[in-house]
């Protein structure tokens, strides 16, 4: 949170920006939200995700991975693909954040209210 408060993240270029080596870095992403059927579910084992909305509105669908079909973990990408349905969701607008723990399956880039829009977001990756 200190880093986010001390840096103008909106001015950061897309891509990965190191903060403390592999222990802590931030990925800046920009994309257009879409229908949920166009998106995928994921979870992570090695990092927490802290999603901080910089511009726009995005729905993130959520479910615990224990409620989902877990596919083969891709260790080099810290990527656990999952399949299932949401049991809840959050809508992030500018300044909002969401922390996803290893047991939290999440599907990002969902169009809130069915309305597609461009967003810019910082995703802090925090090694656990």
Where are these regions (language model features)?
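A short, N-terminal "cap"/entry segment at the start of jelly-roll beta-barrel domains
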Residues: 1-28, 35-43
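Conserved metal-binding segment of the jelly-roll/cupin
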Residues: 91-111
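Short alpha-helix capping/helix-loop boundary micro-motifs
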Residues: 46, 82-87, 109-110
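A short hydrophobic beta-strand segment most commonly corresponding to one strand
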Residues: 50, 97-99, 115-128
């Amino acid at each position: 949170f200190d880093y986010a408060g001390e840096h103008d993240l909106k001015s950061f270029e897309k891509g990965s920006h190191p903060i403390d080596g592999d222990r802590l870095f931030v990925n800046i992403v920009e994309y257009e939200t879409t229908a949920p059927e166009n998106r995928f579910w994921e979870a992570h084992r090695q990092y927490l995700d802290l999603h901080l909305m910089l511009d726009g509105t995005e729905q993130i669908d959520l479910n615990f991975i224990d409620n989902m079909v877990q596919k083969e973990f891709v260790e080099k990408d810290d990527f656990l693909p999952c399949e299932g349905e949401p049991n809840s969701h959050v809508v992030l607008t500018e300044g909002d954040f969401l922390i996803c723990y290893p047991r939290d399956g999440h599907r990002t880039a969902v169009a809130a209210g069915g309305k597609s829009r461009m967003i810019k977001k910082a995703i802090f990756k925090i090694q656990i």
